[in-house]
């Protein structure tokens, strides 16, 4: 995601990458294995060079909103894909919310990933406990997009106009209107149906589990 965001930079802007990289002793949930050299290699390969990117190695818990604003100014697009615990996710979302420019967008990764349920808990904490100024406005495969409520309609309309064939439905999340978009062959509805089919097939191969499922649902099939 960072590489894509880097390609959207204006001439007077810089990107800021914050990652543990080789400091894996700080990776409390083992959610990634960063490599600074590989990151720079990918920047050179896909973005031309690492020029225009400020790289900070370390934990985001040691970063403040003031640090971010002093380094790159108000942020238009902020990707949250760091630690995957509830508290780390909430921390990173708070940094993003505080660093955003007017009309800025936060992109949260892995919210619906069943392997990382604490990411969803972190967003819930950020919104309801930390009283976030942000709300979701769009969902795509693997990601939730957030902005200030007064910008929601603007960005939802822009997404629908930009990707009319990807738009699947309108819904709500945490009381806020959201647009659901698939990407290419990744239709969220078809993905959900596929997972249900896989689950049913798995349950049928486990008689005890199948019996439990029938008891819980009251269904014989």
PLM region spans:
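S-adenosylmethionine/decaboxylated-SAM
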Residues: 1-218
């Amino acid at each position: 995601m960072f590489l894509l965001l880097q390609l959207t930079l204006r001439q007077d802007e810089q990107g800021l990458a914050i990652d543990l990289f080789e400091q894996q002793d700080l990776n409390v949930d083992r959610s990634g294995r960063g490599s600074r050299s590989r990151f720079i290699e990918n920047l050179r390969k896909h973005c031309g060079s690492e020029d225009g990117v400020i790289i900070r190695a370390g934990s985001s818990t040691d970063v403040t909103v003031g640090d971010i604003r002093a380094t790159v100014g108000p942020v238009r697009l902020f990707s949250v894909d760091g630690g995957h615990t509830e508290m780390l996710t909430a921390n990173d979302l708070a940094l993003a919310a505080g660093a955003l420019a007017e009309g800025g967008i936060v992109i949260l990764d892995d919210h619906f990933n069943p392997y990382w349920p604490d990411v969803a808990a972190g967003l819930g904490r950020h919104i309801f406990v930390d009283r976030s100024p942000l709300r979701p406005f769009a969902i795509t495969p693997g990601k939730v997009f957030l902005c200030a409520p007064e910008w929601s309609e603007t960005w939802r309309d822009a997404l629908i106009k930009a990707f009319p064939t990807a738009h699947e439905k309108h819904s709500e999340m945490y009381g806020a209107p959201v647009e659901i978009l698939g990407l290419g062959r990744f239709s969220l509805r078809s993905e959900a149906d596929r997972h249900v089919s896989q689950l049913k097939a798995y349950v049928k191969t486990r008689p005890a589990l199948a019996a439990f499922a029938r008891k819980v649902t009251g269904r014989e099939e």
